[in-house]
Regions:
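Short, Lys/Arg-enriched N-terminal segments with co-localized hydrophobic residues
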Residues: 4-22
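Alpha-helical membrane insertion/targeting regions
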Residues: 17-287
């Protein structure tokens, strides 16, 4: 005797299909939220914080907003990376290491300005050595990824090595003179912002620039800016001098022009992820 057919709600294949569709909807919603938060962070909050660098109270407010938003973007982006990619692939390892390296810059920068604002001459504590160890471990991860392949990863590993050399030299010297802490703050915060611009470049300049160039141009430009700001802040009496204003102005100008292009790119209502780099959609600007 033939049994009665299963109701749709009891069919395992349909239950699994509905569950998958529900998960996909949540995934897409998180991507949308990630994008809605990401673009203002890159093109409004961060430039506003840079422009307010000579007004400590205002700069601090925008800086806190940048820290909180970037933390949100890192957490959601990391979740999307783990949820949307095969964990055994090189691309997955690259994304995890690269994104943590970029995000961690804001932590080092925040620690530096916290010490800079203290009365007297701060000295490195156990936390500072732990952060230095974290930076070293992250750079080691970049070196492992870069050893497999990829010119941009090799450049980022080189940048990381330079940061490590500066890090341990400044720790050895006990953050003296105190202006070192201001240099550390500008170095790391700017590095975090150029990381953000790198992610946006990967997403929106996939067809306009060669594959390696879209990854590295923010680092090349950022290296010049960071070198200029570091030189401007070498003396405690001149942490916000003319050269620093020029470097910050150039960075904001690039951000404004870049924001205009991104707005145009989004308005075209077509996929903007470069071929072969869809994995980067899980970061600041997912698609």
């Amino acid at each position: 005797m033939q049994g009665e057919p299963l109701h749709d709600s009891h069919r395992p294949d349909l239950i699994e299909e509905k569950a998958t569709a529900h998960m996909n909807d949540r995934y897409e919603l998180l991507i949308l939220i990630h994008r809605v938060v990401g673009y203002p962070t890159a093109f409004v909050v961060a430039p506003a914080a840079l422009l307010a660098f000579a007004k400590p109270a205002l700069h601090r407010q925008w800086g806190k907003a940048y820290l909180y938003l970037l933390t949100f973007l890192y957490v959601t982006g990391t979740f999307l990376t783990f949820a949307g990619h095969d964990w055994h692939t090189w691309d997955f390892a690259r994304n995890v290491v690269f994104n943590f390296f970029g995000f961690s810059m804001v932590l080092y920068g925040w620690r530096a300005i916290h010490l800079f604002r203290q009365v007297g001459q701060p000295i490195p504590t156990r936390l500072d050595w732990v952060l230095a160890g974290m930076l070293s471990a992250t750079v080691l991860g970049l070196l492992v990824v870069a050893a497999v392949r990829d010119t941009p990863m090799r450049l980022f590993a080189l940048v990381g090595i330079i940061f490590c050399v500066l890090e341990f030299r400044e720790l050895r010297d006990g953050f003296q003179p105190k202006s070192v802490l201001f240099r550390r703050h500008t170095r790391f915060i700017l590095a975090s912002y150029f990381y953000v611009l790198t992610v946006v470049s990967i997403v929106h300049l996939g067809d306009e620039l060669p594959r390696d160039l879209k990854w590295i141009w923010p680092t090349l430009f950022g290296g010049l800016v960071i070198a200029a700001t570091g030189n401007a802040a070498r003396r405690f009496a001149q942490p916000r001098g003319k050269l620093l204003r020029l470097a910050v102005g150039a960075t904001v100008l690039v951000a404004v022009l870049y924001a205009g292009y991104v707005a145009y790119d989004l308005s075209r209502d077509m996929p903007v992820v470069g071929q072969g780099n869809a994995d980067m959609r899980t970061q600041i600007s997912p698609r």
